[in-house]
């Protein structure tokens, strides 16, 4: 019998920072130890245009959708689109709000992110989230010097969820894919401010996770090589060599949770450079 864990996509859509939703999703996922969620976190989704872009991404990598959206019309839009796509969805807050209303009476009004105190720390986190979402997967490469952290790594080394976790702690984080024969942007090497960290994992782990990604969405790869362990080993060799050449620290995420990877990065930031 094969012992390999099954992977599934877990899409988390929030109109705020997403912390509440991440906790709920992980609390549920941990009850299924033989299934491993591939988290996709979409914070600050507050209008139909943003929601539609998210749902297009979900359509390419179907899975379970959890969302905390206070606006009833936007929540209804997400629910209907999930039905059209054919994926299960749960509005995590709605049953709780319904119970509160039944006991306390109708809401005066619904407030996005009302659980967060509007202080300097909160606004720093929102600024970090905005920066991180704008600089996901190599986007907006011209201003990496404004980042606190830049994560580099081959496809499926948890760069995006780690970036969002760090952003939720007020750390502006960009991430860039390492693709052999595709040079990294010169702006990265010119940046003096950020800590640059390489993320790696074992070939087996990456192959398993990549096997659950729709190959048509992957650029820069021959589909036959994308999940091939020998090809992945070559990608990892290139990534390690690149990080060693530039003296960038490397973290192996194979057996680390997102929280553990983020904690290791935060510890690296605390060290003199």
From Swiss-Prot:
Keywords: Kinase, Nucleotide-binding, Serine/threonine-protein kinase, Transferase
InterPro entries: Kinase-pyrophosphorylase, PPDK_reg
KW Nucleotide-binding (keyword) present: yes
Domain of life: Bacteria
Single annotated GO MF: protein serine/threonine kinase activity
Enzyme Commission number(s): 2.7.11.32, 2.7.4.27
Catalytic activity from the UniProt record: N(tele)-phospho-L-histidyl/L-threonyl-[pyruvate, phosphate dikinase] + ADP = N(tele)-phospho-L-histidyl/O-phospho-L-threonyl-[pyruvate, phosphate dikinase] + AMP + H(+); N(tele)-phospho-L-histidyl/O-phospho-L-threonyl-[pyruvate, phosphate dikinase] + phosphate + H(+) = N(tele)-phospho-L-histidyl/L-threonyl-[pyruvate, phosphate dikinase] + diphosphate
Binding-site list for ADP: 153-160
Family label: Belongs to the pyruvate, phosphate/water dikinase regulatory protein family. PDRP subfamily.
PANTHER family noted in UniProt: PYRUVATE, PHOSPHATE DIKINASE REGULATORY PROTEIN 1, CHLOROPLASTIC (PTHR31756:SF3)
Function statement: Bifunctional serine/threonine kinase and phosphorylase involved in the regulation of the pyruvate, phosphate dikinase (PPDK) by catalyzing its phosphorylation/dephosphorylation.
Full protein name: Putative pyruvate, phosphate dikinase regulatory protein
Organism in which the protein naturally occurs: Allorhizobium ampelinum (strain ATCC BAA-846 / DSM 112012 / S4)
């Amino acid at each position: 019998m094969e012992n390999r864990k099954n992977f599934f996509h877990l899409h988390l859509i929030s109109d705020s920072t997403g912390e509440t939703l991440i906790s709920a999703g992980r609390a549920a996922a941990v009850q299924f130890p033989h299934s491993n969620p591939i988290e996709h976190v979409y914070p600050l989704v507050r209008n139909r245009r943003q929601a539609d872009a998210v749902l297009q991404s979900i359509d390419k990598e179907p899975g379970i959708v959890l969302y905390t959206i206070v606006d009833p019309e936007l929540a209804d839009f997400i629910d209907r689109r999930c039905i059209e796509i054919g994926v299960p969805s749960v509005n995590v807050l709605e049953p709780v709000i319904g119970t509160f209303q039944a006991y306390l009476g109708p809401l005066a009004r619904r407030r996005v992110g009302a659980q967060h105190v509007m202080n300097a720390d909160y606004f720093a986190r929102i600024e970090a989230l905005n920066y991180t979402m704008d600089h996901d997967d190599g986007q907006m490469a011209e201003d990496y010097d404004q980042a606190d952290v830049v994560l580099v790594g081959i496809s499926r080394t948890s760069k995006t969820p780690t970036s969002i976790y760090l952003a939720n702690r007020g750390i502006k984080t960009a991430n860039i894919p390492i693709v052999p024969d595709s040079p990294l942007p010169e702006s990265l090497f010119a940046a003096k401010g950020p800590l640059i960290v390489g993320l790696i994992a074992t070939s087996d782990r990456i192959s398993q996770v990549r096997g659950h990604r729709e190959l048509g969405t992957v650029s820069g790869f021959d589909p036959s090589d994308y999940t091939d362990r020998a090809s992945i080993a070559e990608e990892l060799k290139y990534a390690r060599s690149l990080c060693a050449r530039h003296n960038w620290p490397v973290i192996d995420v194979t057996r680390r949770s997102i929280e553990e990877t983020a904690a290791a990065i935060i510890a690296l930031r605390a060290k003199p450079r």
